[in-house]
Amino acid sequence: MLTITAINAFNDNYIWVLQQDTQQAVYVVDPGDVNVVLDYLNAHQLTLAGILITHHHRDHTGGIAALVAYVEQTTGHTLAVYGPQSEAIQGVNIAIEPQITQILHLPFLNSPVQVLSVPGHTAGHIAYLVDGALFCGDTLFSGGCGRLFEGTPAQMCHSLRLLAALPAETRVYCAHEYTLANLKFAQAADPSNAKLKAYNEQATALRAQGKATIPSTIGLERSINPFLRGLTPTIVDSIKQQFCDQDLSNVDELTYFTLLRQWKDIF
């Protein structure tokens, strides 16, 4: 069985730890903070088998160099660091071109890891899918999606469609605890969504207890996330009201997605 554990970092980051059965060697996803990772490894008597990086932002990559140095000093081995080839991330020594390398077979993990190209938040953003668990970095959040720092709306829209097409039971391990803020916007865009209202109540209760709202599931996100709900009439109506100065009488789904993301940016 693959066990997935969250390490809290910074204000709202999650660094994910992947451990197969009782193996002592584990993988971490997007270790922005070296100290919390080392504290976790030492507290649980674990060793680091490798690092999986989704994109180049510092809060996801800041711990790479120190973790590589730590493994070299303590074991004499070179730590495997996987990441997107197109983003030229310092410390990544196994660069992945997702159009070429779509499956990784990693030591200490029983199941293959699928690599998905999901540009939008950054130009070369990738995601990892293993044992029904999706590590999607800053592409898909519960109730929302990442800002478009480098990619285009068309790229992000395509990436989200790709993720939305995964099986409903796929667990979504995003990299930030943004859920409540996202749901506040989601309810403004989709005010009559009863499932969204119920999920907001559930998420609010979890956060009040200091618990994570992550993982979500693809099935849940399809029902509550406005960025996965396409041309849902209530969302279209909300966008038209927000952008009432524009003629939206005959536009496509991408235009609505673009406007929805612009609205979220200023919400």
Swiss-Prot record:
Alphabetical list of InterPro entries matching this protein: Clx_II_MBL (IPR035680), Glyoxalase_II_hydrolase (IPR050110), HAGH_C (IPR032282), Hydroxyacylglutathione_Hdrlase (IPR017782), Metallo-B-lactamas (IPR001279), RibonucZ/Hydroxyglut_hydro (IPR036866)
Catalytically driven reaction(s): an S-(2-hydroxyacyl)glutathione + H2O = a 2-hydroxy carboxylate + glutathione + H(+)
Binding site for Zn(2+) 1: H55, H57, H121, D138
Residues that hold Zn(2+) 2 according to the record: D59, H60, D138, H176
Pfam family, one: HAGH_C
Name of the protein this chain belongs to: Hydroxyacylglutathione hydrolase
HAMAP family: Glyoxalase_2
One GO BP: methylglyoxal catabolic process to D-lactate via S-lactoyl-glutathione
Family stated for the protein in its record: Belongs to the metallo-beta-lactamase superfamily. Glyoxalase II family.
Cofactor(s) recorded in Swiss-Prot or TrEMBL: Zn(2+)
EC number(s) reported in the record: 3.1.2.6
Cofactor remark from the record: Binds 2 Zn(2+) ions per subunit.
Record's function text: Thiolesterase that catalyzes the hydrolysis of S-D-lactoyl-glutathione to form glutathione and D-lactic acid.
Taxonomic lineage from the root: Bacteria, Pseudomonadati, Pseudomonadota, Gammaproteobacteria, Alteromonadales
SMART domains, alphabetized: Lactamase_B (SM00849)
Top-level EC class: hydrolase
Complex and partners: Monomer.
Pathway(s) where this gene product acts: Secondary metabolite metabolism; methylglyoxal degradation; (R)-lactate from methylglyoxal: step 2/2
Keywords: Hydrolase, Metal-binding, Zinc
GO molecular function, one term: metal ion binding
Gene3D superfamilies: Ribonuclease Z/Hydroxyacylglutathione hydrolase-like
SUPFAM superfamilies linked to this entry: Metallo-hydrolase/oxidoreductase (SSF56281)
